[in-house]
């Protein structure tokens, strides 16, 4: 848990350090709100990519639990493996949707 907190501290300090540089790129258009919209696009993209990170974390947990289940009951390995693969494919769809939404936010919005 402390490594997750360390990672979030590094990310937040990086954002704090680079926020003025990002805002200064559109300093001329801050009066009409375009600069804030520019910042909002990238903040929104970062939030959508949190879904992809959560998917990766949960896929690791589900795979670890499947390995433990097979270790406890080796006869059930084919059923556990097929169920795990279907579950991981459905979970990966969420990460792909998050990536698509992020790309749309950056290039279309």
UniProtKB/Swiss-Prot annotation:
It is a multi-pass membrane protein. The chain crosses the membrane at residues 42-62, 88-108. GO terms for molecular function: lipid binding; proton-transporting ATP synthase activity, rotational mechanism. The record marks 92 as: Reversibly protonated during proton transport. Keywords: ATP synthesis, Cell membrane, CF(0), Hydrogen ion transport, Ion transport, Lipid-binding, Membrane, Transmembrane, Transmembrane helix, Transport. One of its GO terms (cellular component) is plasma membrane. It is found in: Cell membrane. F(1)F(0) ATP synthase produces ATP from ADP in the presence of a proton or sodium gradient. F-type ATPases consist of two structural domains, F(1) containing the extramembraneous catalytic core and F(0) containing the membrane proton channel, linked together by a central stalk and a peripheral stalk. During catalysis, ATP synthesis in the catalytic domain of F(1) is coupled via a rotary mechanism of the central stalk subunits to proton translocation. Key component of the F(0) channel; it plays a direct role in translocation across the membrane. A homomeric c-ring of between 10-14 subunits forms the central stalk rotor element with the F(1) delta and epsilon subunits. Belongs to the ATPase C chain family. Dicyclohexylcarbodiimide (DCDD) binding to the active glutamate residue inhibits ATPase in vitro. PANTHER family: ATP SYNTHASE LIPID-BINDING PROTEIN, MITOCHONDRIAL (PTHR10031), ATPASE PROTEIN 9 (PTHR10031:SF0). F-type ATPases have 2 components, F(1) - the catalytic core - and F(0) - the membrane proton channel. F(1) has five subunits: alpha(3), beta(3), gamma(1), delta(1), epsilon(1). F(0) has three main subunits: a(1), b(2) and c(10-14). The alpha and beta chains form an alternating ring which encloses part of the gamma chain. F(1) is attached to F(0) by a central stalk formed by the gamma and epsilon chains, while a peripheral stalk is formed by the delta and b chains. This is ATP synthase subunit c. It comes from Ureaplasma parvum serovar 3 (strain ATCC 700970).
């Amino acid at each position: 848990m402390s490594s997750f907190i360390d990672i979030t501290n590094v990310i937040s300090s990086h954002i704090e350090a680079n926020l003025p540089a990002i805002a200064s790129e559109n300093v001329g258009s801050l009066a009409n709100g375009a600069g804030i919209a520019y910042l909002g696009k990238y903040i929104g993209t970062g939030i959508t990519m949190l879904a992809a990170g959560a998917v990766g974390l949960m896929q690791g947990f589900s795979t670890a639990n499947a390995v433990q289940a097979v270790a406890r009951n080796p006869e059930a390995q084919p059923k556990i493996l097929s169920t795990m693969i279907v579950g991981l494919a459905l979970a990966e769809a969420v990460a792909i949707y998050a990536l698509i939404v992020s790309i749309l936010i950056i290039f279309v919005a």
